Amino acid sequence: MVSIIERAPAKINLGLDVLGKREDGYHDLEMVMISIDLCDYVTVSPLKDDVIMIESDCPKMPINEKNDVYKVAKLIKSRYAISEGVSILLNKKIPVCAGMGGGSSDAAATIRALNQLWDLKLSMEEMIAIGIAIGSDVPYCIQAGCAKIGGKGDRIELIDGKLSSWVVLVKPDFGISTRTVFPEIDCDVISRVDISAIVNALEGNNYSDLITHMGNALEDISIARKPFIQKVKDKMVAAGADVALMTGSGPTVFALCQTEKQANRVFNSVKGFCKEVYKVRTL
């Protein structure tokens, strides 16, 4: 029995801007994302019976049809008339409900893995089309790397630049639901983020410009709910981080550091402050 293992890296937002609200009630976002080497692992194995089985080592994860990984398998089986079943094992390292795209990355890894397992020979465009049907972050996660994202997550422009940085992550012991953040957005008063300046800094390998322009338009809303997020940011900067920023809708905060020594100082400053602290690198 042949199994396929795919790595599912987490992502952080170097920039997140809200452009406005669409007629359908959703918001147009513009983001810059980059993958980090904190990863889940997705293992898919064939089953003779026509079933979809999901296992996970994380008790917080649903292992039924509510899981995006299940939705991916069901959609691919239906779209490409696959009659055999599949077992999907999720080894979780990325915190859940953390704004780091763990669920989306797992779904993307499942698309890539099933493409191999069932020899579908899907193009990148075809895999992205499946991802769009699952969730807005999934198309980016299929390619991963460093990219500018627009629209519903389907406009992906890979950035020709290399950010080699240490990243310290802090996941507070509470979650923030993205669905509850967006109704509070007032596009007339939120802090805007210059996404073009971030892209230019990355393409020009200008680290100083990058940290100057990084920002997250959702930060003020999430911090108003959970002031602890600001305390984490302040603590990281005080310990020597070049910049500290919330990723996604939170609550996870990350710090960028150019040296491992610097990252160790930041890591040690927050290690006793929160239970979930990670020191990783950009991919």
From Swiss-Prot:
Keywords: ATP-binding, Kinase, Nucleotide-binding, Transferase
Top class in the EC scheme: transferase
Short name of one Pfam family: GHMP_kinases_N
Top-rank lineage group of the source organism: Bacteria
Catalytic reaction(s) noted: 4-CDP-2-C-methyl-D-erythritol + ATP = 4-CDP-2-C-methyl-D-erythritol 2-phosphate + ADP + H(+)
UniProt: ATP binding residues: 95-105
Listed InterPro entries: GHMP_kinase_C_dom (IPR013750), GHMP_kinase_C_sf (IPR036554), GHMP_kinase_N_dom (IPR006204), IspE (IPR004424), Ribosomal_Su5_D2-typ_SF (IPR020568), Ribsml_uS5_D2-typ_fold_subgr (IPR014721)
Catalytic machinery residues: 11, 137
SUPFAM superfamilies the UniProt entry points to: GHMP Kinase, C-terminal domain, Ribosomal protein S5 domain 2-like
Keyword ATP-binding: yes
BP term (GO), one: terpenoid biosynthetic process
Protein task: Catalyzes the phosphorylation of the position 2 hydroxy group of 4-diphosphocytidyl-2C-methyl-D-erythritol.
Family, as annotated: Belongs to the GHMP kinase family. IspE subfamily.
Protein known as: Putative 4-diphosphocytidyl-2-C-methyl-D-erythritol kinase
Originating species: Streptococcus uberis (strain ATCC BAA-854 / 0140J)
